[in-house]
Amino acid sequence: MNEEQPLRIVSLLEKEMSLAGKRIAVLGLAFKAGTDDLRESPALPLIAALLQKGAAVVAHDPIAMPLAMRRADFASVGLMDSWMTALQDSDACCIVTAWPEYQAIHPAEFAKRMRQALLVDGRGIFDPRAMAASGVTWRGVGYTPVCLNGHSIQGRNENG
């Protein structure tokens, strides 16, 4: 994820809803899967931007939670013990780190747990068609909207 992608995620969210007062789940705090390293993590500017827009942010990471709990920049973030509790009653979810446990989430789980099933997939780990079939609005960084069987998805890379 490059430096501009957190702001693109915010832009994609704002095209779907006003962020003020919305509960936004951020899945993945470490800069990459397999580490607890938060340095250079795209989650940091993303969370800061969401909080600035008035969103209530909840987050989960499989191994970076202990470090996140000690950081001042996570003081206003609800740090959840599982992706399931992070998704519960959220208005949107942002995938920031491609952890295997996030990749294994069945699309129906998003629709079942979330208030509004809006997923911004910053890592391109989910199939947009499977998301649409489960009633999830899928937005991906670097994709343009297309329509499939009446469902809006983003299935084509903007760069070719």
Where are these regions (language model features)?
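Structural/interface elements that position substrates and couple domains in central-metabolism enzymes
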Residues: 1-160
